[in-house]
Amino acid sequence: MAHRKRQSTASSMLDHRARPGPIPHDQEPENEDTELPLESYVPTGLELGTLRPDSPTPEEQECHNHSPDGDSSSDYVNNTSEEEDYDEGLPEEEEGVTYYIRYCPEDDSYLEGMDCNGEEYLAHGAHPVDTDECQEAVEDWTDSVGPHTHSHGAENSQEYPDSHLPIPEDDPTVLEVHDQEEDGHYCPSKESYQDYYPPETNGNTGGASPYRMRRGDGDLEEQEEDIDQIVAEIKMSLSMTSITSASEASPEHMPELDPGDSTEACSPSDTGRGPSRQEARPKSLNLPPEVKHSGDPQRGLKTKTRTPEERPKWPQEQVCNGLEQPRKQQRSDLNGPTDNNNIPETKKVASFPSFVAVPGPCEPEDLIDGIIFAANYLGSTQLLSERNPSKNIRMMQAQEAVSRVKRMQKAAKIKKKANSEGDAQTLTEVDLFISTQRIKVLNADTQETMMDHALRTISYIADIGNIVVLMARRRMPRSASQDCIETTPGAQEGKKQYKMICHVFESEDAQLIAQSIGQAFSVAYQEFLRANGINPEDLSQKEYSDIINTQEMYNDDLIHFSNSENCKELQLEKHKGEILGVVVVESGWGSILPTVILANMMNGGPAARSGKLSIGDQIMSINGTSLVGLPLATCQGIIKGLKNQTQVKLNIVSCPPVTTVLIKRPDLKYQLGFSVQNGIICSLMRGGIAERGGVRVGHRIIEINGQSVVATAHEKIVQALSNSVGEIHMKTMPAAMFRLLTGQETPLYI
């Protein structure tokens, strides 16, 4: 059972009168961000993957766990970064290793966005990338920084196919001193993880940490969505019966915390560590008896206890104070009628169970207060990364970060030995503080804050043996954005390179640290729901899963692809040095076979001359090389490589350019599970009824229930989808193909 330290403990790291440490929930700076979008804490952005065969397989940290396949283990992905955060850069020593540097987020107004690649065709079509990755797709929901984005479900699944991202060596080392602001719109639906803090006493909900840099007047539009709209959207996804019963419940019935359920305070001698320091697990961890080290000194939990009345109170205050912020965009949940958005400003905290079961090594209550792990800080480095790389790329980046830090450590050790006869100490003992709000790195001896990251800024954490890699997103000021974003003119938003801060730690509890952070996302999301009068149990997907299991997969795609008459092997003749003369686009994540689609052919080119190809055909392989699951850029490179050949062998599946979608929705309470922006499908929830029906990311909706929506306003498309029940018939095609066919884009033949 979890134990928390008494608030009166003098040695608590949260007692700021004694020493710096994590800020208690009720003592957070007044200017902290107070906005809490619904998507803020959806833990579905986390993926689990293992590097050790003996790693346990925790369930996915999701509120809506639709996916039958749980990722196996303990590296966590938060592919939810759309907006950006200001973070203090770490000044680098000559050898490139950083120690004892304060590192704090300067702007807690971080908000993830969901765009459609800035315009209409999102790089999320990339999801078809790695074949394995398609099944491990990241599921997130966020607000968009683009035009109007409307969510059709509580989560979506996306993985980005540009999985050939090289780890740039030209920017190899530690963090630069200046902060720089990421500045791009990106589409794939993701969710942002927002810290929730008490609002400012003056009612200002601008949302910035004490380290926030001065903003210009032009940044007003970056303020986040008002929370009442978000709460309204959540409630629309619930049945009216459950909402009524929830709202009638009284706060007096909230589960009481046992006052005796706290541990003895750790004395200062317990927290100080000498050269023979042993690392101890928090008492809150649910470890099997054989795993616990009874002889280890328990640094235990250094937390602040809140009463049951206080806990729901501070997030609830934000509901009242968050209304003044302008909405960056309009967003509707297509789970129910879109006109039911009038939710009272004040909400009663219903008597819901404290927590729905959240798999993980910690007690949920302890994660709210914060737990501490002992670790050694090895160093930090910086990598360039795409906005949302695949899980494989994330792991490659983590390994690259470890390699860099170890090289820097080795160089520093050699240099120190050369300058002095003394022993070169390159390890820094730290306390790794994890809570549902933030992750802090504290000097184990002085308890000084070395690094401070809001939980929502953590994009990935992996354990590699006894090494923990923590990746956090950086936000860059617009004036320096060009120095930090590597891109080429005309490049897609998803192809831009963004700076990622990587901290490397060593701990015997590496796997538990990774799992605890993943669990923290889930607990934070449930806290947000409870604070706004929504019973987390109402979001149970059992009934929804029963509906899904009765539906056929991919509409009629299986029949079409299994029909041998549609599968053809073609031989094309061409002149040496002549291009094939085609334009290909991605089939879109969600298609049964993620590959490229023939979108256009050059008049008089080899492809058009043959008369064997048609627009809409899916190319399975070229000269024996399979294109299934490969990123678009890789497929284009293979086609370009045919220039000096005189014969080309193609395996294709003949398909019409328009895809037929059939979604079976028995009732409005069942979420559709995809989001739309300006007629483009931006995100898709893995395992949802939309995926079953053939919805594909990156496709433009052409027709809904027999009515053309090509020239229909975005709001009307959303309304039509929101109110549709029964069988929903749609016709879609890749957005890039639509733009080519309508003359909105000039084809670039290859």
From Swiss-Prot:
Keyword Repeat in the entry? The reply is yes
Which GO cellular component terms are attached?
cytoplasm; cytosol; dendritic spine; plasma membrane; presynapse; Schaffer collateral - CA1 synapse
Q: Which residues carry this modification: Phosphoserine?
A: S11, S209
Which SMART domains does the record match to this protein? PDZ, PTB
Q: Which residues form the PDZ domain?
A: 569-655, 660-735
GO MF annotations in UniProt? amyloid-beta binding; identical protein binding; phosphatidylinositol-4,5-bisphosphate binding
Any Gene Ontology biological process: locomotory behavior
- The segments labelled Disordered in the record are 1-94, 143-226, 241-347
Please quote what the entry notes about the protein's domains: Composed of an N-terminal domain that binds STXBP1, a middle phosphotyrosine-binding domain (PID/PTB) that mediates binding with the cytoplasmic domain of the amyloid-beta precursor protein, and two C-terminal PDZ domains thought to attach proteins to the plasma membrane.
SUBUNIT field: Part of a multimeric complex containing STXBP1 and syntaxin-1. Binds to the cytoplasmic domain of amyloid-beta protein, and to the nuclear factor NF-kappa-B/p65 via its PDZ domain. Interacts with the N-terminal domain of NECAB3.
- According to UniProt, the name of this protein is Amyloid-beta A4 precursor protein-binding family A member 2
Source organism per entry reads Rattus norvegicus (Rat)
Q: What is the lineage of its organism?
A: Eukaryota, Metazoa, Chordata, Craniata, Vertebrata
